[in-house]
């Protein structure tokens, strides 16, 4: 009986670890932020225009947050 209980406990622990690793599958991969969806790329490299176009690190200036037309 003790062996069965230990086996079930190990199985439950294994399933918990597997489900915890699956939880990270919803997040976009790092390469998707740089190359994938263009809106994600804009969000990552946008610059508000109140900086008067003085954007750092080659960012683009967007008048309406990150989704507006490039200035």
UniProtKB/Swiss-Prot annotation:
Its main location: secreted. Residues 21-41 form a propeptide. Disulfide bonds join 46-61, 47-55, 49-66. One of its GO terms (cellular component) is extracellular region. InterPro entries: Neurotoxin_3_Anemonia, Neurotoxin_3_sf. GO terms for molecular function: sodium channel inhibitor activity; toxin activity. Residues 1-20 form the signal peptide. Keywords: Disulfide bond, Ion channel impairing toxin, Nematocyst, Neurotoxin, Secreted, Signal, Toxin, Voltage-gated sodium channel impairing toxin. It comes from the Eukaryota. Transmembrane segments: none annotated. It is found in: Secreted; Nematocyst. Voltage-gated sodium channel (Nav) inhibitor. 1 uM completely inhibits insect voltage-gated sodium channel inactivation (DmNav1 from D.melanogaster). Belongs to the sea anemone short toxin (type III) family. This is Delta-actitoxin-Avd2b 2. It comes from Anemonia viridis (Snakelocks anemone). The lineage of its organism: Eukaryota, Metazoa, Cnidaria, Anthozoa, Hexacorallia.
């Amino acid at each position: 009986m003790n062996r069965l209980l230990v086996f079930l406990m190990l199985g439950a622990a294994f399933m918990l670890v597997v489900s915890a690793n699956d939880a990270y599958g919803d997040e976009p991969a790092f390469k998707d932020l740089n190359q994938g969806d263009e809106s994600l790329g804009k969000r990552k490299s946008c610059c508000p225009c109140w900086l008067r176009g003085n954007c750092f690190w080659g960012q683009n200036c967007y008048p309406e947050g990150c989704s507006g037309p490039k200035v």
